[in-house]
Amino acid sequence: MTIQYTFSMIKPDAIKRNKIGQVNTYLENEGLKIVAQKMTTLTKYEAECFYDEHRARPFFDSLVEYITSGPVVLQVLKGMDAITLNRKVMGATNPAEAEAGTIRKDIGESIEANSIHGSDSENSAKREIKFFFKKSEIIE
């Protein structure tokens, strides 16, 4: 087990329903420390760049439209095996298939409006953190 950093984004559906605190509680109860957090509304350009790996997929346009539909909360999380731990507490992408007690099962509304995004690998975590945060914004 190693200490890692990972990226998390609380999505517009959760923000609209005032679930930021609830999501943060799930993360912190799993032993993840929030070392950076900020709220913003992504531009279309930012969303397209962030989700560039999905550009050829049929859901790309609706994903960009959804993620820019309202504010998001961007986070850097730190903890032992943080990437795997965050993926576990988030639950399956589709809330209908997620385990009880996970963020997506308990808060998510649909496969798109599933309340949270999290890095799926070390490379993704590094890229996603660097995309949104300066080193000076990450407070240990």
From Swiss-Prot:
Keyword Cytoplasm on entry: yes
The residues listed in the UniProt record as binding ATP, with positions renumbered to this chain, are K11, F59, R87, T93, R104, N114
Q: Where is the protein found, in the record's own terms?
A: Cytoplasm
Q: Which NCBIfam families match?
A: PRK00668.1
- Family recorded in the similarity comment: Belongs to the NDK family.
What the entry lists under PANTHER family is as follows: NUCLEOSIDE DIPHOSPHATE KINASE, NUCLEOSIDE DIPHOSPHATE KINASE DDB_G0292928-RELATED
Q: Which CDD domains match?
A: NDPk_I (cd04413)
Recorded hits in InterPro entries, A to Z, give: NDK-like_dom (IPR034907), NDK-like_dom_sf (IPR036850), Nucleoside_diP_kinase (IPR001564), Nucleoside_diP_kinase_AS (IPR023005)
According to its UniProt record, the EC number is 2.7.4.6
According to the record's subunit comment, the protein's assembly and interactions are: Homotetramer.
Q: What is this protein called?
A: Nucleoside diphosphate kinase
Function text: Major role in the synthesis of nucleoside triphosphates other than ATP. The ATP gamma phosphate is transferred to the NDP beta phosphate via a ping-pong mechanism, using a phosphorylated active-site intermediate.
One family from Pfam that matches here is NDK
| Keywords from the UniProt entry | ATP-binding, Cytoplasm, Kinase, Magnesium, Metal-binding, Nucleotide metabolism, Nucleotide-binding, Phosphoprotein, Transferase
Q: Membrane-spanning residues where?
A: none
Any one GO BP annotation for this protein: UTP biosynthetic process
